[in-house]
Amino acid sequence: MGIKDLVKDAHNNAKNHGFWEDWERIEQLENMAINISKDGEKQVKIDKCNAIATRLMLIVSEVSEALEGIRKDNIDNFKEELADIVIRVADLAGGLDINLEKQIKNKMDKNKYRPYKHGKTF
């Protein structure tokens, strides 16, 4: 499976299981806010930022679960949680219409020319 298919499938699955209901409500409010006021538009932007932050924290929770898999010497759980991390990232990219494959390629190209350990100690 390629990255584009992964993003599409992960997002569709998350959406079908209710993980984007908040975003859909925000978009409905956004459509109404356009006709209401600048304050309404500002609130929609804040709500979208909060929804993105929630999804980022879900990614962090999967990272924590992967760590626990290692701490408990459960390599199968660790592998499963790594998959969850990628799925959540792909879902977020799909929901925000980010071309994740392009972003990954650009970042990998950028990293080729960075200093050893990117100039840091570790």
Label every model-predicted segment.
Residues 1-82, 86-122:
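Flexible "arm" and connector segments at domain edges
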